[in-house]
Amino acid sequence: PCIAQSVDPAIGFFVNLLSIGFIVISACHEPLYGSAGLYLFAYMFLYGNPVEGRLLVLRALEMLLGLLICGAVFYVNHRKKQYEKRFFQIVKEFSLSTPLGKWQFQVILGLSLGILVGELLQVDRVMWVGCACLTVLTQYGERPNKRAFQRLGGVVAGSLLFGIVYQVLPPAAKSSLGIYSGLLLGLCAAYHWKTLLNCFG
């Protein structure tokens, strides 16, 4: 993400395309496990919180430490298991002719384009554009346009409801609005309700 942000948006698009493509193809070959959302939200978090100089070095060291810890845990728990596929086999099996390959391509291209549009429009927090794209695109086996309409409806309804509730609430209660909406968000299963409650955060 730090490289993509330091260059022209058009070049950044290709940097993001390659980076996101590597993540999705190498680590998201079981979409029902939800790993795409996890890894790509982490990518967008890094994109939305850029650092330079000493802080960038510290971030790299933190990530290396996290990698070593996770690698050690993974090794201890899985060292006796036999895996049918190696890393390069997974990468070689990527194909646009399979449902998995089409879904992976949809996520890679959609997220990269979302970031590019956010950069070209000079959105303050491009991270949120990417996160919105992710919630629409990463659901395996579901048409993205259905979730896009649910998101649009949830945002419109949530924004209107937030405006009304914020005007009615006493000043002392307004600071707790995000906390309570977050708690309610955890109880929601339907995507449109989650989108609506996100407007309160």
Per-region residue spans from a language model:
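Alpha-helical transmembrane segments and their membrane-interface boundaries
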Residues: 1-197
